[in-house]
């Protein structure tokens, strides 16, 4: 069954109809202000009741930050529309929940705030250090092209009270450190910004349920272009193994060029058009990075013989 969201008169979006694709990694790109963040908030609502409250912030002033539009969700012939009432609550027009029919176990929205840039202090260690899970060590080393994380340790800290169990493995109860000599370590507080952002992202992905929808804002955040490409390889493998649907918002040409599933959001007249399977060169050109599609070297030859000679010896010339 087709699954679709229609956003009307919300923030900068007058109208957008977005059809959800199947499993795999999908790149969503477009100019700033085209509606990527708004779309992610609407997608997050499929499994998160507080998505509108945390994503559509308001003030107490009567003429500021008003949301007068609507968000409609479709699964086949079924539909539910949410609007914001005078009470301040977002309410559906019908009392039936079609969100379960989207068939996602959960929706995980990894934005550029809070947990993405979180670093754990070492003020109150609770237990002796333990080796870090092999999957995390391998992923960090592989994506960052290093071996510095091979002996990384995990230290349980903070308040371990929890109703859900496994409190010692929660990110807020976990600190990481790397040994530099006998009985000497440096903690994650001294990791580079790119390292801590990647560590937190991987932690979130690993703790996501299979068959879930994952929304990642600005995947390239603080990462070298080569690391971005290796991270994309990792995410493609995770999506395949765990049946994940991953949406990534980005302006990174390195990321856009690595994926065939590029979705371009483009403002046309009075609406946001959605272009699926968009060629990377078109997407890059649309977001104003024309230089990234231009050749590094242009060689002009006199005739076909010169062209053949150049092609035969191209490696030594270029």
Whereabouts are the PLM-identified features?
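Extended helical coiled-coil dimerization/tether regions that scaffold
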Residues: 112-191
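RecA-like P-loop NTPase motor core
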Residues: 257-318
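Conserved ABC ATPase signature
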Residues: 31-33, 173-203, 219-223
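Pre-Walker A (Motif I) flank of P-loop NTPase domains
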Residues: 23-26, 184, 211
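H-loop/switch region of ABC-family ATPase nucleotide-binding domains
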Residues: 249-251
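Conserved hydrophobic alpha-helix in the ABC-type ATPase nucleotide-binding domain
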Residues: 230-235
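Pre-Walker A-like glycine/lysine-rich segment at the N-terminus of P-loop NTPase domains
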Residues: 1-40
């Amino acid at each position: 069954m087709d699954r679709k969201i229609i956003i009307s008169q919300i923030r900068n979006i007058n109208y957008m109809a977005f059809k959800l694709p199947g499993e795999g990694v999908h790149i969503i790109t477009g100019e700033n202000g085209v509606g990527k963040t708004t779309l992610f908030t609407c997608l997050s609502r499929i499994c998160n009741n507080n998505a509108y409250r945390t994503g559509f912030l308001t003030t107490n002033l009567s003429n500021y930050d008003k949301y007068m539009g609507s968000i409609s969700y479709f699964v086949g012939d079924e539909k539910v529309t949410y609007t914001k009432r005078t009470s301040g609550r977002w309410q559906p027009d019908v009392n039936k929940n079609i969100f379960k029919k989207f068939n996602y176990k959960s929706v995980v929205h990894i934005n550029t705030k809070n947990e993405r840039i979180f670093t754990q202090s070492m003020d109150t260690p609770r237990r002796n250090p333990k080796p870090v899970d092999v999957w995390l060590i391998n992923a960090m080393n592989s994506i960052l092209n290093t071996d510095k994380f091979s002996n990384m340790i995990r230290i349980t800290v903070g308040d371990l009270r929890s109703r859900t169990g496994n409190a010692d493995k929660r990110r807020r109860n976990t600190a990481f450190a790397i040994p530099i000599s006998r009985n000497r370590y440096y903690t994650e507080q001294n990791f580079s910004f790119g390292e801590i952002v990647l560590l937190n992202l991987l932690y979130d992905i690993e703790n996501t349920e299979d068959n879930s929808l994952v929304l990642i804002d600005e995947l390239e955040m603080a990462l070298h272009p080569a690391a971005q490409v290796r991270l994309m390889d990792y995410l493609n493998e995770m999506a395949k193994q765990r049946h994940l649907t991953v949406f990534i918002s980005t302006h990174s040409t390195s990321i856009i060029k690595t994926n065939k599933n590029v979705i371009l959001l483009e403002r046309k007249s009075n609406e946001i058009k959605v272009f699926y399977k968009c060629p990377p060169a078109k997407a890059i050109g649309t977001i104003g990075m024309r230089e990234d599609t231009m050749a590094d070297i242009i060689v002009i030859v006199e005739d076909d013989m010169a062209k053949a000679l150049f092609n035969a010896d191209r490696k030594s010339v270029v």
